[in-house]
């Protein structure tokens, strides 16, 4: 009160404050001359911090500035000023870092200077930090269909006084419906640092629940009530912050995946490398257990046999009446008389040597062969001199045959074989050629068809069946005998055939070369 402070002392106190303002410590007797100001000094643990607060009884007085001084009672020391609580207008001060001994008693002196008339007063008391009550921590509640999550936030604790106090003081969570207390929960808090969550279960939907926290201390400082109404359709599990976080994460993942897919389609990443089969482990299991190869559909193939007839040389030795008969080029035995040029026979020889009676059966062919052999033996022996080639004078006793040997192939193929003088040259690709040696040129005019039959038997057991043409059903018609002067070989060595060692006499006037 202003009445308790004399005006004369104002100047002295002001002088003392100015002198001691620069001092960190002063003796307790320095405040003996200050008048006392009635006040209340309290200490509490608020949010794990040791808070010293005071309150003046005369609340109607003018505002004032406060300076805090303290000292330990058990120690004979001077008063120490708290820097962060010097000349301040707040009525509280954090002394957590200053008062480290919980069981000690501290002497507190607060110098009060009124700003109106500059009167100085003091307010002092004895404080024990171990007796400081605990204020409840800050907390949040989240309601669900049938339960409530209570989350408490404990700041980091650096003072041993606070740690010991929180471990020894029971913690209470009061659950109430309206004004009636439903239940009190006393969870055991092992860790006083960080967040702690407690679940209130077995709650009724559509009900308004209120929650309050406090430490069961003397005096107990209770937190204000926080209420929530449980909704029946409200799902449990996630809060709004969790939903926002999940939504943001999904959007980031979608953007990342879309970017990767776009870059892959453009061709900037994930390029395909054609690795060798040795480094291809894509079908590694099939190497160990090979799969059965799938069956393949096979189309049926129908084979249609076709008989292709070979084109044969068609030789016509007689008139046009025999042109429709097929005359092959080779016999089964490999011998032929075709491909040789000679002079034609006379008219009498043409009429007598008609080839209209071909041999069709083996028995009749054998009889005719015997008859032809007998006729040939009756002929007078002719000299073995080989006849001249086709280049002799055509004005001789025999006229050239009018029917020229014709080829059954097209004219374009054998055009190169035609020679001057109506002579036709054929390539005879056989191992041997039979030539008949005539002793008399006049004797060939009266030869009959049976005498002109050629026997190609190389042994006594050969029959006329060897004369059948390969690939045909008919036998070769007998050929008219040619004079020795009209027979010639392909190489033009007919003159050396008489003296050649390779010529062999096969009988009946024939020699084989």
UniProtKB/Swiss-Prot annotation:
> What task does this protein carry out?
Together with IFNAR1, forms the heterodimeric receptor for type I interferons (including interferons alpha, beta, epsilon, omega and kappa). Type I interferon binding activates the JAK-STAT signaling cascade, resulting in transcriptional activation or repression of interferon-regulated genes that encode the effectors of the interferon response. Mechanistically, type I interferon-binding brings the IFNAR1 and IFNAR2 subunits into close proximity with one another, driving their associated Janus kinases (JAKs) (TYK2 bound to IFNAR1 and JAK1 bound to IFNAR2) to cross-phosphorylate one another.
Residues assigned to the Extracellular compartment are 22-242
Pfam families listed in its UniProt record: Interfer-bind, Tissue_fac
Query: What species was this sequence derived from?
Result: Mus musculus
Oligomer status and interactors? Heterodimer with IFNAR1; forming the receptor for type I interferon. Interacts with the transcriptional factors STAT1 and STAT2. Interacts with JAK1. Interacts with USP18; indirectly via STAT2, it negatively regulates the assembly of the ternary interferon-IFNAR1-IFNAR2 complex and therefore type I interferon signaling.
Q: Which residues form a coiled coil?
A: none
Chain positions carrying an annotated carbohydrate: 42, 58, 65, 78, 84, 149, 191, 195
| Source domain of life | Eukaryota
* Bias kind Low complexity: ranges: 377-389
Which residue positions does the secretion signal occupy? 1-21
Q: What is this protein called?
A: Interferon alpha/beta receptor 2
Any one cellular-component term (Gene Ontology): plasma membrane
Q: In which tissues is it expressed?
A: Widely expressed. Detected in liver, testis, kidney, salivary gland, thymus, brain, lung and placenta. Isoform 1, isoform 2 and isoform 3 are expressed in brain.
Cystine pairs annotated here are: 39-123, 85-93, 210-227
Any stretches that span the bilayer, and where are they? 243-263
The chain residues annotated with the modification Phosphotyrosine are 335, 510
Modification after translation, per record = Phosphorylated on tyrosine residues upon interferon binding. Phosphorylation at Tyr-335 or Tyr-510 are sufficient to mediate interferon dependent activation of STAT1, STAT2 and STAT3 leading to antiproliferative effects on many different cell types.
Where in the sequence is Phosphoserine found? 403, 448, 465
Topology feature Cytoplasmic, residues: 264-513
Give the gene that encodes this protein.
Ifnar2
**GO molecular function term, any single one:** type I interferon receptor activity
- Show the segment(s) annotated as Mediates interaction with STAT2 (and required for the recruitment of USP18): 421-444
Region Disordered, annotated ranges? 334-402, 458-513
Annotated GO biological processes are: defense response to virus; immature T cell proliferation in thymus; regulation of transcription by RNA polymerase II; response to interferon-alpha; response to interferon-beta
